[in-house]
Amino acid sequence: LEFIKENALLIGLAVGSGIALLWPMLNRGASGIPNVSPTEAVMLMSRAKPLVLDVRDAAEFEAGHIQGAKHIPLAELSNRMKELEKYKDKPVLVHCQKGMRAKTACSLLRAQQFTKLHQLQGGLAAWQEAKLPIVKSA
């Protein structure tokens, strides 16, 4: 008991660090949708040929996007779900700029029985940070 009192700050830091390290795994497990790093995304793209779904706004998409990405802004996704029907049992790599909109999009797609969803961890920002190519709309 004396040890705990004297080292409460260190114990708190250790517990906090452990939670911070485990959070991505816990978060991934809760959604059931795997987060893939930019490097893993490139491997997925070369092996499984997924639909790359960009759910960012039009201006963001035009400023730069992954080659071959299908653009459906998150705000339009529910109304445009029919465009994606043929991908229900095929790999789909969903991304936005940082990851929050993609997470919402994955939840919407999962509710429509899409079975092979992947989310680009860190979004296009992480893709660009990894020095991977983007293309701009003409």
PLM feature spans:
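Short, surface-exposed ligand- or partner-binding patches at beta-edge/loop junctions that are enriched
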Residues: 94-95
